Amino acid sequence: MPDASPSCAGQAAEDHALEHLRGQGLRLLARNWRCKGGELDLVMLDADTVVFVEVRYRLHAGFGGALGSIDGRKQKRLTLAANLFLQSEPRWADKPCRFDVVALQGQGHAGQPLQWLKNAFEC
């Protein structure tokens, strides 16, 4: 069987991350929210905190792996998208916010450990 396309692998990684986060009590507010500045993979609510979750998948650990792929430029794009989300959804604008990263590495996700880095960066 041929390897899954990168978009299929990324979708599977997001599905796995969403399932894990829901199991930890987070509630989904939006998925793949798009704007001119970029995309937010998952927007979730953890108690009263709005959580912007970037899901990163890498097949191999080269070049820093999944976690290493969140550079300063990516952080700025996520921050911009989060601000636009809050402007478009004012009911969440007065809530505390944080940026989390869920990283998955390797082939296949079922049963694979994931890394959930809460408060991965400050904005």
From Swiss-Prot:
Family per record: Belongs to the UPF0102 family.
CDD domains with a match to the protein in the record: PoNe_Nuclease
GO molecular function, a single term: nucleic acid binding
InterPro entries associated with the record: Restrct_endonuc-II-like (IPR011335), tRNA_endonuc-like_dom_sf (IPR011856), UPF0102_YraN-like (IPR003509)
Name of the protein described by the UniProt record: UPF0102 protein PSEEN4497
Organism: Pseudomonas entomophila (strain L48)
HAMAP family: UPF0102
Residue ranges of coiled coil: none
